[in-house]
Amino acid sequence: MKSCKNNEKILLINDFLSSGNIGGSLCKSVLNFYSFDIDFVPTALISNMFSLKPIEIFDSSDFLTNTLEVYKKQNRKYKAIFVGFVLNFNQAKIICDFVKENNLFMVLDPIMGDSGKIYSGLDKNIVEIYKYMADYAHIIIPNLTEARLLTDNKFKKAHDIVDYFENIGKKFIITSVEDGNRHFILAKDKYFIEEDYKFLDKSFGGSGDLFDSIFLANYLKNNDFLLAIKNTRDMIACILDMQIKIDDKANDISINEILKKL
């Protein structure tokens, strides 16, 4: 599979991990594969995945602030901004002010938790931080845990959460919903979108980052919400199948090795 020549610029704001193919590094690799030009500004430098202890986190708020100011002076233009891991409210405000001032199309992954729990080590106000950022986002891509957190657990059904966000003008994609033996991606574009996928009883770090970046690339390429979701599902299935063949016990995805083969 070859990517088309594009060269449109995306501003990527996410964490940078010194160990592991996840976070902003994975997103940048995938978006580069689709021939987008990426400016990657890290919100934090992190020693390793949150699942591994201990962990060291360096707050790069000053760098974020100064770099965005530099880019503003350079009059850089972006097709979109993607925001993932945010460390604190100060960063959220800096980013959202930049989005508002430059009238940017924003895609947000509210990285807060999974399996019903908030990740350890996050800001105690992390839910309020991402609720604030969601007001500025055009597309929001949480897992089910994060979707519930964004709505203060008001809704029992995932479909009601998607409805809620559509009613306030947001496109909302829940990356993983389980209903009996079914596993599907849930979204809505006038009508509900349920895209089934094959459930793997394996967990690779960076799967969420993979979804974010593949979806963003496809959506910006064709501006078709449903098609972008379908293409994302199919591409992830292909990549994870290749990862299992490479090393099914790996903590993360060998993204650069895999992209070379596509």
Question: Model features per residue range: what roles?
Answer:
Residues 120-193, 226:
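Conserved phosphate/ATP/ADP-binding segment of small-molecule kinases
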Residues 2-120, 256-259:
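Conserved N-terminal subdomain of the carbohydrate kinase-like
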Residues 226-262:
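Charged C-terminal helix
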